A protein has these predicted regions:
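Non-catalytic all-alpha helical scaffold/repeat segments
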Residues: 1-129, 192
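Residue at a conserved register position within TPR or TPR-like alpha-solenoid repeats
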Residues: 157-158, 175
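Short amphipathic alpha-helical heptad-repeat segments
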Residues: 139-151
């Protein structure tokens, strides 16, 4: 429920106006700090997306309703400065299966027209890769396969959802940069042996 997510956001992030209860005991401050850290940890590690079933199918109505309700709650709870980050992270968690990128993702991105949401989608997708290992002097082959994957995503949406296409283009550029860097590292490793 978006209300539960907003509760975590309220505990993890200060309000837009910076207002905090001034008259609280030291133990209450310590409790709030612990709750803030725990809430932030939960939010940061959230790997699901609303409206997605156990098979990776997305219900567009549930997802859209959830996202827009989260925006309403952010106004009520004075957390409008962090809601884009959370929405971007949620949308970045959509399953990258055969139907990816889902049309609802493109629709929401185009409706919101938020550079901040777009950037947090990109960050979430990029960070979802995790740590990589590679063979000696392998170079940037892993990254180039990701460039090709994101190019295929971009090509699917480029005319209908230009903002989403831009996210995929930025991911392509980022992985191309890392591919070139890994090629350089491989050349150095090759010279050493």
């Amino acid at each position: 429920k978006p209300e539960m997510l907003m509760e975590l956001m309220v505990m993890a992030y200060k309000s837009d106006d910076g207002y905090e209860d001034k008259e609280v005991s030291e133990s209450e401050i310590n409790n709030r700090n612990v709750m803030a850290r725990c809430s932030f940890h939960i939010l940061y590690n959230l790997s699901c997306c609303p409206g997605v079933d156990n098979h990776g199918n997305v219900n567009p109505n549930i997802l859209r309703t959830y996202i827009y309700r989260l925006y309403e709650l952010s106004v009520e709870h004075h957390r409008t400065q962090v809601v884009d980050m959370m929405v971007g992270s949620l949308l970045g968690n959509l399953p990258r299966n055969d139907s990816y990128p889902q049309s609802v993702l493109g629709e929401i991105v185009e409706e919101l027209k938020s550079d901040s949401v777009d950037e947090h989608i990109r960050i979430k997708i990029f960070n979802s890769r995790g740590v990589t290992t590679r063979a000696f002097a392998e170079g940037g082959n892993q990254e180039r396969s990701l460039v090709a994957l994101f190019k295929s995503y971009r090509d699917k949406v480029r005319f209908k959802y230009p903002r989403l296409a831009k996210i995929f283009t930025n991911l392509m550029r980022e992985y191309e940069h890392y591919a070139n860097h890994e090629d350089y590292i491989a050349q150095l490793e090759d010279l050493e042996y």
